[in-house]
From Swiss-Prot:
Subcellular location per the Swiss-Prot or TrEMBL entry: Mitochondrion inner membrane
Species in which this protein is naturally found: Ellobius tancrei (Zaisan mole vole)
Quaternary state and interactors: The cytochrome bc1 complex contains 11 subunits: 3 respiratory subunits (MT-CYB, CYC1 and UQCRFS1), 2 core proteins (UQCRC1 and UQCRC2) and 6 low-molecular weight proteins (UQCRH/QCR6, UQCRB/QCR7, UQCRQ/QCR8, UQCR10/QCR9, UQCR11/QCR10 and a cleavage product of UQCRFS1). This cytochrome bc1 complex then forms a dimer.
Residues that bind heme b b562: 83, 182
Reported cofactor(s): heme b
Gene Ontology MF annotations: metal ion binding; ubiquinol-cytochrome-c reductase activity
Function of the molecule: Component of the ubiquinol-cytochrome c reductase complex (complex III or cytochrome b-c1 complex) that is part of the mitochondrial respiratory chain. The b-c1 complex mediates electron transfer from ubiquinol to cytochrome c. Contributes to the generation of a proton gradient across the mitochondrial membrane that is then used for ATP synthesis.
The protein's name: Cytochrome b
Lineage start: Eukaryota, Metazoa, Chordata, Craniata, Vertebrata
Residues the record lists as binding a ubiquinone: 201
DNA-binding listed as a keyword: no
Cofactor binding notes: Binds 2 heme b groups non-covalently.
Family label: Belongs to the cytochrome b family.
SUPFAM superfamilies attached to this UniProt entry: a domain/subunit of cytochrome bc1 complex (Ubiquinol-cytochrome c reductase), Transmembrane di-heme cytochromes
Amino acid sequence: MTIMRKKHPLIKLINHSFIDLPTPSNISSWWNFGSLLGLCLTIQILTGLFLAMHYTSDTSTAFSSVAHICRDVNYGWLIRYLHANGASMFFICLFLHVGRGVYYGSYNMIETWNMGIILLFAVMATAFMGYVLPWGQMSFWGATVITNLLSAIPYIGTTLVEWIWGGFSVDKATLTRFFAFHFILPFIITALVLVHLLFLHETGSNNPTGLNSDADKIPFHPYYTIKDFLGALLLLATLMMLALFFPDALGDPDNFTPANPLNTPPHIKPEWYFLFAYAILRSIPNKLGGVLALILSILVLALMPFLHTSKQRGLTFRPITQTMYWILVADLLILTWIGGQPVEYPFIMIGQVASIAYFTIIVILMPIAGMIENNILDMN
């Protein structure tokens, strides 16, 4: 078996990636989220496949087909709620994975980091289109509001929006194409994940100290396979608890009402995992400015390798930047809260302050803190 594992052209690839892969001996549970994201993607593709067997992407039957899945299909309710809450688990793991990368300076592996940003955009696009498919009130109005943002692009904006809609409003053509894209994108994401791993295995994993770990590597299997398995069990337990006990806790009550173009919901808002970006979008009075800020809220991550001023890689031994980091985390939680609030005083002002703070911490304060820490080290 050992000979086959190391010689067979296909099994050899798996062996080098998941079995004999030299891994730092000191990586903590924060390094579990990569494998958990792989598990989330697998769950989403499988549950999505079974949902697609019963779903119809037609405006007149989409809503009732989802109701049919929940009422008449064997365990359809479970598949639907695993898929809906699986998306939430996916984003929780994504945010923790990115947060770990920022904290421990993993963004210095530029190819892997940039691939991760592309993946983040792809997953966000997939989740947005998936939210439109049940064709409830929030699905319809969410799709209308978010796609309409593209009309802010000078000269070609309006034409572009109508091209995406397939008409003069969000309608049958829009739903059909969103379903097609929502189906194909997870497979594209799977291919991108393989590229992400390819880049990662070129450099090897980072570790909590931020030091070179070549002198102290251990094989991935059995040490980290068993560790990842424990993480997977905890993730599945959490997902099952969500899907079975609180299936609609993270959803919007408006989505229990079929889409009606003549009736606008009082507060249009996306799913909870987009609220931070939605708050940044709404905090700028200008439409184009808001769209740019929305894109930059994610794209600013690509600047992190160039804004790294410290002589140390991670934040493990850097108390000033650590403080900045946790203020940034708190700021993102505030933005998430604001994104779900109505557009009125004092929420508008809080959103604007939190949005300015978000970009200021990443672009200005963290690099300055890194330089201050360098000087303190030099003095000693």
